[in-house]
Structures are given as structure tokens and as C-alpha cells.
């Protein structure tokens, strides 16, 4: 399965760096890099699944230390 990540700017006021996630050309999720406002929670700079679409991703909102970890988690979910 081919996953692609497209860089985008997200207009939510603070966590602006984002990635659209596509599987075989279909949008399956939106990842947002958490800003310094999340330092107290210990997740600043990590990637957050803002929204996911389809089986295994809908309703999930985990954080990941980097995009590689996010990709691995998404692949595992899609292969279920």
C-alpha cells in the first residue's frame, strides 16, 4: 500500500504545520505537528492525528514522536 504525506498549513491558530495523509490516492487523515503551547503536556513537536477517515483510523487521536512513527501506526491499522 502506498502512503503519501502532503505538507499543508492548517488554520487553527497555533498548530499550523500539517500533513494530509493519502493511501492509494485517497485522503485518509490529517496530521498536525503540535506547537510549543503543548510543552507542559510533554508533546510539543509531536504529530497528532487530528482526524482519520475509514476503518481503523476514524475516532482515533494518538500522538507520534515523528512522521515515521505515524506512518508505521497508520500502516498497521490499515492492514487489519
Where in the sequence are the language-model features?
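Intrinsically disordered, low-complexity regions of eukaryotic proteins
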Residues: 17-19, 52, 62
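A short, charged, amphipathic alpha-helix used as a generic interaction element across diverse proteins
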Residues: 53-54, 63-80
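Short aromatic-glycine-(Arg/Gly/Cys) micro-motifs in beta-strand/loop hairpins
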Residues: 31-59, 76-77
Amino acid at each position: 500500500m502506498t502512503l503519501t504525506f502532503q505538507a499543508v498549513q492548517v488554520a487553527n491558530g497555533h498548530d499550523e504545520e500539517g500533513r494530509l495523509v493519502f493511501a492509494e490516492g485517497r485522503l485518509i487523515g490529517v496530521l498536525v505537528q503540535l506547537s510549543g503551547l503543548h510543552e507542559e503536556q510533554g508533546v510539543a513537536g509531536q504529530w497528532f492525528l487530528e482526524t482519520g477517515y475509514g476503518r481503523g483510523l476514524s475516532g482515533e487521536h494518538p500522538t507520534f514522536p515523528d512522521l515515521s512513527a505515524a506512518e508505521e501506526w497508520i500502516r498497521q491499522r490499515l492492514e487489519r
